[in-house]
């Protein structure tokens, strides 16, 4: 006679059932992060496609911005709300639109809709990488790396306009609209001379350089056990085993630079560190611009240029260009302010 002693299995609740369904092995993994990711990504992308196809920016910027009005892929945009809307969330049922969808689109409600759903969609994608990394049993460095573009998006599209007078000063969602925003950043903030922008450029271009060098080096050092192997004959794209030589790569770069990465972990961490840190730094810089913190100011050069008509530097030239951008862009970009600049206040070069 056998007596089995044990606990009765606990009754499965709705959480366990939902957890099983969300984590089921399927073609497109859903997961708990998918509850945030998929609806937000769908609504953000759908809102952008709807706005660029049908919705005008006439009421907010005095511009045509949709395919329906004759724009193309590079010139369509979902524009920011009017300056008079301040930092209102512009909810469809809010006091501005009062449930009128057409009025909501005219006021720029699609922009806040896309910006907020886009931000949460990106966060959901990062959480998806965390979740799958945990289930697969790998480290979460992909998710950590993806925090960099999220930081840039949030700082540029949300934090910067929150530091200014309204959502109006954020970028509109479109290619040409982003270019206009870059000119705005340069003219009003001298962004290219900001050290955080410099670190961002160094990170992005440095990351691209590292990727090119790394890919080329791996291709250069492919090998195959056996005789007569060359780089192009040695490798089968479907083979399982690793077939490149870290030792050979180390020897090559040691001869080129006199220094080389000694192991793969440090090499790949550096490739992660450079672009991610650059993007984080640029995001910090944009937060500074939201607070209207200034870039480098070389006052001594400005004073000397003002006193001496023959003294000019690239720095003082750029300041004149920035003044020109402001003088042109403020009346064009903010027609509601009714700016009028007399001839005598417009920028001139020292030689004039």
Curated annotation (Swiss-Prot):
<dbReference type="GO" id="GO:0005506">
    <property type="term" value="F:iron ion binding"/>
</dbReference>
<feature type="binding site">
    <location>
        <position position="142"/>
    </location>
    <ligand>
        <name>pheophytin a</name>
    </ligand>
</feature>
<feature type="transmembrane region" description="Helical">
    <location>
        <begin position="194"/>
        <end position="217"/>
    </location>
</feature>
<feature type="transmembrane region" description="Helical">
    <location>
        <begin position="109"/>
        <end position="131"/>
    </location>
</feature>
<feature type="binding site">
    <location>
        <position position="129"/>
    </location>
    <ligand>
        <name>pheophytin a</name>
    </ligand>
</feature>
<keyword id="KW-0408">Iron</keyword>
<dbReference type="GO" id="GO:0009523">
    <property type="term" value="C:photosystem II"/>
</dbReference>
<dbReference type="GO" id="GO:0009772">
    <property type="term" value="P:photosynthetic electron transport in photosystem II"/>
</dbReference>
<dbReference type="GO" id="GO:0031676">
    <property type="term" value="C:plasma membrane-derived thylakoid membrane"/>
</dbReference>
<keyword id="KW-0148">Chlorophyll</keyword>
<keyword id="KW-0479">Metal-binding</keyword>
<feature type="binding site" description="axial binding residue">
    <location>
        <position position="117"/>
    </location>
    <ligand>
        <name>chlorophyll a ChlzD2</name>
    </ligand>
</feature>
<feature type="binding site" description="axial binding residue">
    <location>
        <position position="197"/>
    </location>
    <ligand>
        <name>chlorophyll a PD2</name>
    </ligand>
</feature>
<feature type="binding site">
    <location>
        <position position="214"/>
    </location>
    <ligand>
        <name>Fe cation</name>
    </ligand>
</feature>
<keyword id="KW-0472">Membrane</keyword>
<keyword id="KW-0560">Oxidoreductase</keyword>
<feature type="binding site">
    <location>
        <position position="268"/>
    </location>
    <ligand>
        <name>Fe cation</name>
    </ligand>
</feature>
<dbReference type="InterPro" id="IPR005868">
    <property type="entry name" value="PSII_PsbD/D2"/>
</dbReference>
<feature type="topological domain" description="Cytoplasmic">
    <location>
        <begin position="218"/>
        <end position="265"/>
    </location>
</feature>
<feature type="topological domain" description="Cytoplasmic">
    <location>
        <begin position="1"/>
        <end position="31"/>
    </location>
</feature>
<protein>
    <recommendedName>
        <fullName>Photosystem II D2 protein</fullName>
        <ecNumber>1.10.3.9</ecNumber>
    </recommendedName>
</protein>
<keyword id="KW-0793">Thylakoid</keyword>
<dbReference type="InterPro" id="IPR055265">
    <property type="entry name" value="Photo_RC_L/M_CS"/>
</dbReference>
<feature type="topological domain" description="Lumenal">
    <location>
        <begin position="161"/>
        <end position="193"/>
    </location>
</feature>
<keyword id="KW-0812">Transmembrane</keyword>
<dbReference type="InterPro" id="IPR000484">
    <property type="entry name" value="Photo_RC_L/M"/>
</dbReference>
<keyword id="KW-0813">Transport</keyword>
<feature type="topological domain" description="Lumenal">
    <location>
        <begin position="54"/>
        <end position="108"/>
    </location>
</feature>
<feature type="transmembrane region" description="Helical">
    <location>
        <begin position="141"/>
        <end position="160"/>
    </location>
</feature>
<keyword id="KW-0460">Magnesium</keyword>
<comment type="subunit">
    <text>PSII is composed of 1 copy each of membrane proteins PsbA, PsbB, PsbC, PsbD, PsbE, PsbF, PsbH, PsbI, PsbJ, PsbK, PsbL, PsbM, PsbT, PsbX, PsbY, PsbZ, Psb30/Ycf12, peripheral proteins PsbO, CyanoQ (PsbQ), PsbU, PsbV and a large number of cofactors. It forms dimeric complexes. Part of a photosystem II (PSII) assembly intermediate complex PSII-I; crystallized from a strain deleted of psbJ, it forms monomeric PSII before addition of the oxygen evolving complex. PSII-I includes 3 assembly factors not found in mature PSII (Psb27, Psb28 and Psb34).</text>
</comment>
<feature type="binding site">
    <location>
        <position position="214"/>
    </location>
    <ligand>
        <name>a plastoquinone</name>
    </ligand>
</feature>
<dbReference type="InterPro" id="IPR055266">
    <property type="entry name" value="D1/D2"/>
</dbReference>
<dbReference type="GO" id="GO:0045156">
    <property type="term" value="F:electron transporter, transferring electrons within the cyclic electron transport pathway of photosynthesis activity"/>
</dbReference>
<dbReference type="GO" id="GO:0016168">
    <property type="term" value="F:chlorophyll binding"/>
</dbReference>
<keyword id="KW-0602">Photosynthesis</keyword>
<feature type="binding site">
    <location>
        <position position="261"/>
    </location>
    <ligand>
        <name>a plastoquinone</name>
    </ligand>
</feature>
<feature type="transmembrane region" description="Helical">
    <location>
        <begin position="266"/>
        <end position="288"/>
    </location>
</feature>
<comment type="function">
    <text>Photosystem II (PSII) is a light-driven water:plastoquinone oxidoreductase that uses light energy to abstract electrons from H(2)O, generating O(2) and a proton gradient subsequently used for ATP formation. It consists of a core antenna complex that captures photons, and an electron transfer chain that converts photonic excitation into a charge separation. The D1/D2 (PsbA/PsbD) reaction center heterodimer binds P680, the primary electron donor of PSII as well as several subsequent electron acceptors. D2 is needed for assembly of a stable PSII complex.</text>
</comment>
<keyword id="KW-0604">Photosystem II</keyword>
<dbReference type="InterPro" id="IPR036854">
    <property type="entry name" value="Photo_II_D1/D2_sf"/>
</dbReference>
<keyword id="KW-1133">Transmembrane helix</keyword>
């Amino acid at each position: 006679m056998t007596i089995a002693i044990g606990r009765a299995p606990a009754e499965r609740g709705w959480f366990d059932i939902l957890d099983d369904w969300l984590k089921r092995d399927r073609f497109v993994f859903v997961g708990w992060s998918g509850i945030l990711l998929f609806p937000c990504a769908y609504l953000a992308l759908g809102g952008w496609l709807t706005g660029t196809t049908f919705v005008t920016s006439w009421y907010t910027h005095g511009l045509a911005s949709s395919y329906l009005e004759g724009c193309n892929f590079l010139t369509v945009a979902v524009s920011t709300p009017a300056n008079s809307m301040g930092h209102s969330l512009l909810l469809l049922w809010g006091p501005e639109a009062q449930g009128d969808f057409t009025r909501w689109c005219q006021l720029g409600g699609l922009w806040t809709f896309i910006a907020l759903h886009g931000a949460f969609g990106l966060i959901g994608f990062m959480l998806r990488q965390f979740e799958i990394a945990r289930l697969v049993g790998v480290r979460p460095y992909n998710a950590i790396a993806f925090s960099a573009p999220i930081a840039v998006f949030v700082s540029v599209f949300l934090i910067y306009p929150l530091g200014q007078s309204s959502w109006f000063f954020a970028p509109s969602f479109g290619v040409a609209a982003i270019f206009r925003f870059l000119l705005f950043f340069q003219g009003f903030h001298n962004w290219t001379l900001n050290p955080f922008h410099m670190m961002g450029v160094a990170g992005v271009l440095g990351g691209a350089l590292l990727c090119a060098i790394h890919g080329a080096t791996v291709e250069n050092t492919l090998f195959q056990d056996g005789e007569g192997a060359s780089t192009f004959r040695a490798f089968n794209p479907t083979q399982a085993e690793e077939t490149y030589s870290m030792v050979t790569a180390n020897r090559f770069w040691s001869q080129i630079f006199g220094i080389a990465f000694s192991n793969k972990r440090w090499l790949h961490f550096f490739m992660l560190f450079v672009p991610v840190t650059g993007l984080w730094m640029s995001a910090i810089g944009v937060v500074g611009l939201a607070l209207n913190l200034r870039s480098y100011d070389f006052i001594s050069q400005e004073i000397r240029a003002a006193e001496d008509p023959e003294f000019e530097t690239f720095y003082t030239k750029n300041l004149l260009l920035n003044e020109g951008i402001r003088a042109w862009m403020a009346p064009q970009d903010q027609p509601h302010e009714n700016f009028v600049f007399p001839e005598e206040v417009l920028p001139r070069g020292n030689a004039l």
